[in-house]
Amino acid sequence: MQEITASELKTRLDAGDDIQLIDVRQPDEYSFAKIEGSKLIPLGEIMRRKDEIDASKETVIHCKMGGRSAQAIELLRKTGFQGELKNLVGGITAWSNDVDPTVLKY
């Protein structure tokens, strides 16, 4: 499974790279803290809503710590999803710690 760190993601976003961010946490978690520009597709809905993920774009999937996002990537791969998928190492917690301390931790 491909991975990307929060710092690497920030550098790529700042450079203007066209990266799709998918957040697989629950709606209450998303409303509390989110990475700007991310789209919420909770893990339990990922299979039903997989067509909302643009396979032509590099996609970074994240959750709180990286576990649910890894599950989401495995599920998508099992269905034959062909796009480039990366797991955000440490999830939104790493984003808050390493990139943007204004993103609340829980």
Positions of predicted regions on the chain:
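Rhodanese-like catalytic fold shared by cysteine-dependent sulfurtransferases
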Residues: 1-20, 27-58, 67-106
